Amino acid sequence: PNIESRFFSSLAKNLEQRCRAEGYALFITNSDGLPENDLDLLALLVTRGVDGIFLVVADELADDSVLVDELSHLPVPYVMIDRVVDNLSCDKVLFDHEQGGYMATKYLLEKGHERIACMVNAAKSMTGRKRLAGYERALTEAGVAFDPSLVVETDYYISDAYEASANVLDTDATAVFASSDNIALGLLKRLYQ
């Protein structure tokens, strides 16, 4: 992932504090969300003799066979966080992204909105696709037809979301489900101008 993400920087901060409290130093590497960097960084950490690894892989690597092979032979314990390989037997910390998208959309529906735009990174992100699925499930459950013209594709960076949010303003949406904090910040920046 990219350490500039509010989610991942907060995760890193909390992991570092907990490790320090337990007498460990946390070394952080940043793949910039590029799958090719994850495997190199994993090898670097093992070479440096770390005691264990908290691993958050790039979205595109979650089902990568090379990654599965590398992790199957990793000589140190590891915990996968957020983005995991389903068929890999290891400790995992998961977030239910589909349920999160569902709950956010259901909240907006309960407030009386039916034309709800969804700003999401579904094209490049498994996490985004799961959040979009939750959005669609909430609409279907409420009897509201899914309208693909209300789905606005964006990356997880504030600047990208700011640019993409112009497309939201071109719709008749009365509410927006922004599928990440950075996407919400980009949207808010647009709305405040």
Tell where the protein language model's regions lie, with residue ranges.
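N-terminal winged-helix
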Residues: 1-17
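Beta-hairpin (beta-strand-turn-beta-strand) motif
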Residues: 1, 31, 58, 83-84
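Short beta-strand segments enriched in small/hydrophobic residues
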Residues: 1-3, 54, 115-121
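Conserved ATP-dependent adenylate/AMP-binding module captured primarily in the ANL superfamily
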Residues: 36-40
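Short beta->alpha connector loops
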Residues: 32-35, 58-62, 182
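Bacterial carbohydrate/catabolite-sensing allosteric modules
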Residues: 14-25, 43-49, 62-193
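Short beta-strand-loop elements within alpha/beta enzyme cores
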Residues: 51-57
